[in-house]
């Protein structure tokens, strides 16, 4: 597992003029959050409005996953900007996508999966280079079998759907396509307000075990997508090609951060 100090040390190396990008992933550990004292202490690190949204979730799993996502958002923005998490000020776009209001050098995107929450963030050199990014983490458990594919026909383009029908492993291809589409909607910030069938990634029938990268132009913007397995889920990031060119990679480093590391971070920074 990556420790807080190692993450801070790694990020500190990019301070200055060189852009940087990274993916942070945290497992949703309900056994740790089942302790009432721990759950309530972590909740108190969040604004009251965020606490209310979490408590309004019906299931304990959803409350835990949303809490982990909020903590990861604070953690990631804090260690990359060097600001104490209590100094961070967030706002939301017209469709609810969060952004860091007091530091416009740091576009980021959040996603919640079945077992993990994830964050993709980019450290820009200047505000002139600020561009949105997107991330999604998709689970094969959302695939209901070939007999249910017809129910999702309107979600895919004709080429995508035909490729899916011909795939030898339709479960993986379904998960891959879903993560591609969702990462793009996280990039645009439009979410469910997007007609997913209009986002056409073509006929895909294979997803390599080592992951895959794709360069495609959508809505006149050249974009880089990179997808990879993380345990049993597929993580996909979306970023403008201009950002990929500046950071000189289409595969940012992924940091697997334990929930206990996150908790230690807030303790060390007087949040608990």
From Swiss-Prot:
Gene Ontology cellular component annotations, sorted alphabetically: cytoplasm; cytosol
Top EC class, one word: transferase
Biological processes per GO annotation: lysine biosynthetic process via aminoadipic acid
Reactions accelerated catalytically: apo-[ACP] + CoA = holo-[ACP] + adenosine 3',5'-bisphosphate + H(+)
Keyword terms of this UniProt record: Transferase
Matching InterPro entries: 4-PPantetheinyl_Trfase_dom, 4-PPantetheinyl_Trfase_dom_sf, P-Pant_transferase_sf
Family annotation (Pfam families): ACPS
Keyword Cell cycle recorded: no
GO molecular function: holo-[acyl-carrier-protein] synthase activity; magnesium ion binding
Enzyme Commission code(s) on record: 2.7.8.7
Signal peptide interval: none
More info: Present with 623 molecules/cell in log phase SD medium.
Similarity remark: Belongs to the P-Pant transferase superfamily. AcpS family.
Job of this protein: Catalyzes the transfer of a 4'-phosphopantetheine moiety from coenzyme A to a serine residue of acceptor proteins, such as alpha-aminoadipate reductase. Necessary for alpha-aminoadipate reductase activity.
Protein name (record): L-aminoadipate-semialdehyde dehydrogenase-phosphopantetheinyl transferase
Organism phylogeny: Eukaryota, Fungi, Dikarya, Ascomycota, Saccharomycotina
């Amino acid at each position: 597992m990556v420790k807080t100090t190692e993450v801070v040390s790694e990020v500190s190396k990019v301070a200055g003029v060189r852009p940087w990008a990274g993916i942070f992933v945290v497992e949703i550990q309900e056994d740790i959050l089942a302790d009432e004292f721990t759950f309530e202490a972590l909740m108190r690190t969040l604004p009251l409005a965020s606490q209310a949204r979490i408590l309004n979730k019906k299931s304990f799993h959803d409350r835990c996953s949303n809490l982990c996502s909020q903590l990861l958002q604070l953690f990631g923005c804090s260690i990359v900007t060097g600001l104490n998490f209590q100094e961070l000020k967030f706002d939301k776009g017209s469709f609810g996508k969060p952004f860091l209001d007091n530091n416009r050098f740091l576009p980021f995107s959040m996603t919640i999966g079945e077992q993990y929450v994830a964050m993709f963030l980019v450290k820009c050199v200047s505000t002139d280079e600020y561009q949105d990014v997107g991330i999604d983490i998709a689970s094969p458990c959302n695939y209901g079998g070939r007999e249910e594919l017809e129910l999702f026909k309107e979600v895919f383009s004709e080429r995508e759907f035909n490729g899916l029908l011909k795939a030898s492993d339709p479960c993986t291809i379904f998960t891959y396509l879903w993560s591609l589409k969702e990462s793009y909607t996280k990039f645009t910030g439009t979410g469910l307000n997007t007609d997913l069938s209009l986002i056409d990634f073509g006929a895909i029938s294979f997803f390599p075990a080592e992951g895959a990268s794709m360069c495609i132009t959508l809505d006149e913007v050249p974009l880089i997508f990179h997808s990879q397995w993380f345990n049993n889920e597929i993580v996909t990031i979306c970023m403008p090609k201009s950002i990929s060119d500046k950071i000189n990679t289409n595969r940012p480093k992924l940091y697997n951060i334990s929930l206990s590391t996150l908790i230690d971070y807030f303790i060390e920074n007087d949040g608990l």
